[in-house]
Design a protein with these regions (language model features):
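Carboxylate-rich, polar loop motifs that coordinate divalent cations or form catalytic acidic clusters
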Residues: 1-332
Length: 332
């Protein structure tokens, strides 16, 4: 067993506030990613959505090839790759249009359509649609390709036994760059493996949980999505448990968590069986009254605002132009 002591205390936590969003026309959110501009993209039971923090936008049409369950998302430049129930789709986010793929071409041909297999993962470092419907998670490691499937865990096609006898379905894989270990989420348990992938330790406090997704923030907090809510493991191995409470609108909307994603601002996005949820660590807005910038009570009705690359602000309004840099008195 590993030398790392996994002493964990489970805490039922309700103090942290979740902001929940119901998508128009979709219920289950199964994949989340973010583009270079900060836009959040969502794979759902009905197709692709984007979300700008205010509104959701659907990118599918009913009864077409893109009206389909989306299991995984991955960006390569502005091209968004989608692992779906009918194979791989490609959406050019810049042009806001779908690109022709075998899955698109097969949609109108019943015989070819039946041959399309469900795709659950995307290999963004290899052939993106290389894996069949039995593969639920992949991870490139120093030792080779780690694959989680219906039949268990494999490294370079060599089985790794997690338990005696029949192997569990492996739903989620992640490398922990802070703890220098690998996390393996299965139907029934969460395992931690050393970098050699030789020694495995089961996290006893999570026994019996179906672990569906894993992600980590910059402070080393590990987010674990399960059929029993969301868990957060801190660096000291304490465990917090977030669950739905119908009496509290600031809790997660559903206890079945399909996907969790830490964005570039360290907000944690959670895809559930009942929509999208966000645990915010980043404040989207910073409010500064105009008199604190201009040191004047004259006021200004602003019509245009520009921020330069070096962080300076230019603001134009009914009472003239304001030039402002943080820490420097405004000029106007």
């Amino acid at each position: 067993s590993m030398a790392i002591a996994m002493l964990i205390v489970t805490i039922a936590l309700h103090a942290q506030r979740f902001v929940n969003t119901t998508l128009s026309g979709a219920q289950t959110v199964s994949a989340i990613t973010q583009d270079a501009n900060g836009m959040i993209w969502l794979g759902t039971d009905n197709g692709l959505y984007s979300y700008d923090g205010y509104h959701d936008y659907c990118h599918f049409a009913p009864h077409t090839f893109n009206h389909v369950r989306v299991n995984a998302l991955g960006f390569e430049g502005s091209m968004l790759y989608m692992a779906t129930a009918n194979g791989m789709l490609q959406f050019d986010a810049k042009e806001e249009t779908y690109v022709s793929t075998p899955a698109v071409e097969a949609y109108g041909d019943e015989s070819r359509k039946k041959m399309q297999k469900e795709l659950r993962v995307l290999d963004m470092k290899g052939r993106k649609d290389a894996f069949g419907p039995d593969v639920y998670a992949i991870l490139h490691t120093q030792k080779g390709l780690l694959v989680g499937s219906l039949s268990g865990l494999r490294l370079n096609n060599r089985p790794i036994l997690l338990t005696p006898g029949a192997q569990p379905l492996v739903n989620a894989l992640a490398y922990d760059a802070i703890r220098h270990c690998y996390w393996i989420g299965t139907e029934g348990a969460l395992y931690c493996a050393d970098r050699s992938l030789q020694n495995f330790s089961r996290i006893e406090a999570l026994n019996g949980n179906s672990v569906k997704c894993l992600d980590e923030d910059q402070d080393g907090n590990l987010y674990i999505g399960t059929d029993n809510g969301l868990y957060r493991m801190a660096m000291n191995n304490s465990l917090e448990h977030f669950v739905h409470d119908s009496r509290n609108a600031a809790t997660i909307p559903n206890n079945i968590v399909w996907t969790c994603y830490v964005d570039k601002w360290q907000n944690v996005w959670i895809g559930t069986d009942n929509g999208l949820s966000r645990l915010s660590t980043h404040t989207f807005y910073r409010f500064t009254s105009l008199d604190k910038i201009t040191f004047s009570g004259e006021g200004n009705f602003l019509h245009a605002i520009l921020q330069t690359r070096n962080g300076e602000w230019w603001m134009g309004g009914t009472n003239g132009l304001i030039h402002y840099s943080e820490g420097v008195r405004a000029q106007g």
